[in-house]
Curated annotation (Swiss-Prot):
Recorded superkingdom: Eukaryota
Membrane-protein topology: Peripheral membrane protein
Name of the protein: Photosystem II extrinsic protein V
Keyword Secreted: no
Protein family: Belongs to the cytochrome c family. PsbV subfamily.
GO cellular component: chloroplast thylakoid membrane; photosystem II
Length: 155
């Protein structure tokens, strides 16, 4: 009887553990565990604020630059961590980092032009960034891979 109770206790404890995905927090090697609730929130916010131009991790206005980790890491400065991606959502720059593009890319800096950005808090920006950075772990090459992964191939 005692062994059976221990078995149920172990089952109960493990059944209620939640999984998390690791994401780079900054350029210093900091790592954060992103909980499922945060990912859901980030996905919802991404879909309502970003997906009209970035569906599936692509960039409709420039297909050469996606939201995949390779593209983000090759930007100047690199945008492959939470802090850097949130900074971009506040003050976007060109891929080489030389000019502000706040007048043409939705951002907190241009919320007067892009009203959807007005209601986003700092926590919201981090949730969106977490969604973007975890998608390569969830969708692999489909995230940012473009239409070759989403079109039906005929035989």
């Amino acid at each position: 009887m005692f062994v059976k109770m221990i078995g149920w206790l172990v089952l109960f404890l493990f059944a209620h553990q939640t999984w998390a995905i690791e994401v780079a927090k900054d350029t210093n090697g900091g790592i954060l565990n992103i909980a499922p609730e945060q990912l859901k929130r980030g996905k919802r916010l991404f879909n309502s604020h970003c997906s009209s131009c970035h569906v599936g991790g692509i960039t409709k206005t420039n297909p050469n630059i996606g939201l995949d980790l390779e593209s983000l890491s090759l930007a100047t400065p690199p945008r492959n961590n939470l802090d850097a991606l949130v900074d971009y959502m506040k003050n976007p720059t060109t891929y080489d980092g030389s000019e502000s593009i706040a007048q043409i890319h939705p951002s907190i800096a241009s919320s007067d032009i892009f009203p959807k950005m007005r209601d986003l808090s700092e926590d919201d920006l981090y949730a969106i960034a977490a969604h973007i950075l975890t998608q390569p772990q969830i969708q692999a090459e489909k995230w940012g891979g473009g239409k070759i992964y989403y079109t039906k191939r005929s035989m």
